[in-house]
Amino acid sequence: MASHRLFLLCLAGLVFMSEAGPTGQSKCPLMVKVLDAVRGSPAVNVAVKVFKKAADETWEPFASGKTSESGELHGLTTDEKFVEGVYKVELDTKSYWKTLGISPFHEYVEVVFTANDSGQRRYTIAALLSPYSYSTTALVSDPKE
């Protein structure tokens, strides 16, 4: 049974990463993609907040939105606004699981990263969710690719 679950998790991850490809990424400097590992489907309507670290080390609201039917969130920012800095992406996983009638362990998923320190890049933040665990990864690419 455990090997069956591991196989399904790996398969979901493979599908997830293959879908996190260049569809909307070429136009968006920051894109978020979320997959529900329990149901093996996109995580729809996950609230996403993006913050930028200020000079005084506080977090300032930068952008927000909800994932679509494909589990993706595009159009969070523009190349002009997405300047070099430290950013935090917060996924409201508790509300997502509560909507499905599941009581989760985590309140939210947080990904903190430095962006554009080596020139302008495209960032895809990907998250694979379950009620008691999560995994994140990032795809960073040159906008000319």
Curated annotation (Swiss-Prot):
It holds the Pfam family Transthyretin. The modification 4-carboxyglutamate is found at E60. Sulfonation of the reactive cysteine Cys-28 enhances the stability of the native conformation of TTR, avoiding misassembly of the protein leading to amyloid formation. The keyword Transport applies. The modification Sulfocysteine is found at C28. GO terms for molecular function: hormone activity; thyroid hormone binding. The keyword Phosphoprotein applies. Residues 1-20 form the signal peptide. The modification Phosphoserine is found at S70. L-thyroxine binds at K33, E72, S135. It is found in: Secreted. Its main location: secreted. One of its GO terms (cellular component) is extracellular space. InterPro entries: Thyroxine_BS, Transthyretin/HIU_hydrolase, Transthyretin/HIU_hydrolase_d, Transthyretin/HIU_hydrolase_sf, Transthyretin_CS. GO terms for biological process: purine nucleobase metabolic process. PROSITE patterns: TRANSTHYRETIN_1, TRANSTHYRETIN_2. Keywords: Gamma-carboxyglutamic acid, Glycoprotein, Hormone, Phosphoprotein, Secreted, Signal, Sulfation, Thyroid hormone, Transport. Glycans are attached at N116. Belongs to the transthyretin family. Homotetramer. Dimer of dimers. In the homotetramer, subunits assemble around a central channel that can accommodate two ligand molecules. Interacts with RBP4. PANTHER family: TRANSTHYRETIN (PTHR10395:SF12), URICASE AND TRANSTHYRETIN-RELATED (PTHR10395). Thyroid hormone-binding protein. Probably transports thyroxine from the bloodstream to the brain. This is Transthyretin.
